[in-house]
UniProtKB/Swiss-Prot annotation:
It holds the Pfam family DNA_ligase_A_M. One of its GO terms (molecular function) is metal ion binding. It comes from the Archaea. It comes from Methanocaldococcus jannaschii (strain ATCC 43067 / DSM 2661 / JAL-1 / JCM 10045 / NBRC 100440). One of its GO terms (biological process) is cell division. It catalyses: ATP + (deoxyribonucleotide)n-3'-hydroxyl + 5'-phospho-(deoxyribonucleotide)m = (deoxyribonucleotide)n+m + AMP + diphosphate. Disulfide bonds: none annotated. This is DNA ligase. The active site is at K250. DNA ligase that seals nicks in double-stranded DNA during DNA replication, DNA recombination and DNA repair.
């Protein structure tokens, strides 16, 4: 399968803004692979389309910055000063290289055309090179690809190396294309993808006609996308919908997914990042659980042992992000994990089991229920304990008054509110479901991503003063919903200056456009209808609550979330 043929389709995908047209072009790619290539080619093309070489769950990166890429390109005859000027003009290194490559003698005519396999395997080798002289070796490999590439191939090769394809292709659109082409319900593919986090593997198995492959099943040490809750306007409304339900304390912590096989333990964040090394005390506590193979979910909370109440969320992030002096940090910040679900135990998957059964299995493993109705005194006594592994506090009821008492108690011990869970519901990975709700005392804050930064004035003249913030639609397209500048300390502004300067796409004078990589949580006075923004809404008086380093752009709030909160807000007026 020729890389050139794939790039021609990528170009068509890039030119259209219509999701269905993007899907249909990708269907043509699938058809091309079926005719000219092999299933493994489709696997690689799926990764490439979303700017990856490795599967989504795999944390490895190529680690090639723009500087090394520029050096690789200048070694094949493109002048550095011309390239830098063209990058400034286009705002896109891929387009810049394409335009300049078209002006030099086409040496690529004397070489065999690049194949998908060659491009993919070469970049994999680049990502695996380490040690002394690694930069020179990487430079040679990358240069060899650009030497043989045509101008359009150079555009997508450069973007792939920087892991940003800019064609507007995402996993949901690929899943849609696979569903249409192979005539398989999209919901089925979405579930498999959420379990594997490997769109390439899924596509390959579909082309092989092997959708029941063991490789597509739940697997230890391959984290799965978490099931997410929706917001409910009231406890009464949730009970009206569910009937008898399980209420659990909603913790202000960081969600973790824990995998255990004997003495091997891995801990993953909600973004599926491996945070094992930062949490050694949790690893040791999990090793002592008397189960051989296990996948459980929980909330990791920083605990103040003097009061038994949770410490600020930022303390948890300090632990998660720590790479050095971990022992010292362990003494400063004590952690506790409240387990709340089980997905796998000793060769048996529990994903399709009802929540009531999953909870019972989890309680058998821990050895107690933490039932607020019958064990409240013991629970309160143990708030200040050294316990590292616990199980979420629960109340099973259909009585709104009793549920409200449990909710108020959860707030009184320093937590956020309650989760409300349908006892009969299976675990639906990767979905925001209507079988699990969260209820908090105030309007839900929003997780948004920064897309522009405006240069500051006065006291903020050395930093950026305000930031354009965006939510997303279901396809991953970003929509501005306001600008925020309050709630930030000088240290925050200094941090943002450093981070934003690394991800500038285009300098627009008074402001800069940046890659959507910095996620922040914002509070606001209210959500308003607005013609100013294409999404139709604007935040009134937004303020930064905290940085969400545990979340990526795919996990920010959606326009649908904004609409739902807006309706809840109207109901409260």
């Amino acid at each position: 399968m020729l890389w050139r043929d794939v790039c021609e389709i990528f170009n068509k995908i890039e030119k259209t803004t219509k999701r269905l047209e993007k899907r249909d072009y990708f269907i043509k790619l699938i058809d091309m692979v079926k005719e000219k290539g092999k299933p493994e080619d489709l696997k690689k093309i799926c990764y490439m389309a979303i700017g990856r070489v490795y599967p989504e769950y795999d944390e490895r990166e190529l680690g090639i910055g723009e500087k090394l890429l520029i050096n690789a390109v200048t070694s094949i005859g493109i002048k550095k000063d011309e390239l830098l000027e063209k990058i400034k003009e286009t705002g896109d290194i891929g387009l810049a290289i394409e335009q300049l490559k078209s002006k030099i003698k086409q040496a690529s005519l004397f070489f065999q055309p690049l194949t998908v396999d060659e491009v993919y395997e070469t970049l994999k080798r680049v990502g695996e090179i380490e040690g002394e002289g690694s930069q020179k070796k990487k430079l040679r490999l990358i240069s060899s690809l650009f030497l043989r590439a045509s101008p359009i191939e150079c555009r997508y090769l450069a973007r792939l190396i920087l892991e940003d394809m800019r064609i507007g292709m995402n996993v949901p659109t690929i899943l849609d294309a696979l569903s249409v082409y192979f005539n398989v319900p999209k919901e089925k593919l979405e579930k498999i993808y959420a379990i594997t986090n490997d769109i390439g593997l899924l596509a390959e198995k579909l082309l092989m006609g092997d959708l029941e492959s063991e490789e597509l099943k739940l697997k230890l040490f391959r984290p799965i996308k978490p099931m997410l809750a929706q917001l409910t306007p009231s406890i009464e409304e949730a009970l009206l919908e569910m009937g008898r339900a399980q209420f659990e304390t909603k913790y202000d912590g960081a969600r973790v997914q824990i995998h255990k096989d004997g003495n091997k333990v891995k801990i993953y964040s909600r973004r599926l990042e491996d945070v094992t090394n930062a949490l050694p005390e949790i690893v040791e506590a999990v090793k002592n659980i008397n189960v051989d193979k296990l996948i459980v979910e929980g909330e990791c909370v920083a605990i103040d042992k003097q009061t038994g109440k949770p410490r600020p969320f930022q303390d948890i992030l300090r632990r998660f992000r720590r790479k050095y002096d971990i022992g010292k940090m362990m003494k400063e910040i004590n952690l506790r994990v409240y387990l709340f679900d089980i997905l796998y135990k000793d060769g048996v998957s529990f994903i399709d089991e009802e929540f009531e059964k999953r909870r019972k299995v989890l309680e058998e493993i821990v050895g107690y229920e933490n039932d607020w109705r019958t064990e409240r005194k013991r629970i309160e006594k143990e708030l200040k304990s050294d316990k590292i592994i616990d199980i979420s506090y629960k109340l099973v009821t259909n009585d709104a008054k009793e549920a409200r008492e449990f909710y108020n108690w959860s707030l009184s011990i320093g937590h956020e509110g309650v989760m409300i869970k349908n006892l009969k519901a299976p675990y639906t990975p990767g979905s925001r479901v209507r079988t699990m709700y969260k209820f908090k005392p105030t309007l839900e804050s929003l997780d948004v991503v920064i897309t522009k930064a405006k240069r500051g004035m006065g006291k903020r003249k050395d930093w950026y003063g305000s930031f354009e913030i965006c939510v997303r639609d279901e396809e991953g397209n970003l929509y501005p919903i306001g600008h925020v500048g309050t709630g930030l300390t000088e240290a925050d502004l200094e941090f943002l200056k450093e981070e934003i300067d690394k991800i500038i796409i285009r300098d627009l004078g008074e402001e800069v456009e940046v890659e959507p990589k910095i996620v922040i949580e914002v509070a606001y006075e209210e959500i308003q209808k607005s013609d100013k923004y294409p999404c139709g809404y604007a935040l009134r008086f937004p303020r930064v609550v905290r940085f969400r380093f545990d979340k990526g752009v795919n996990e920010i709030n959606t326009i649908e979330d904004v609409e739902r909160i807006y309706e809840i807000q109207r109901g409260r007026k």
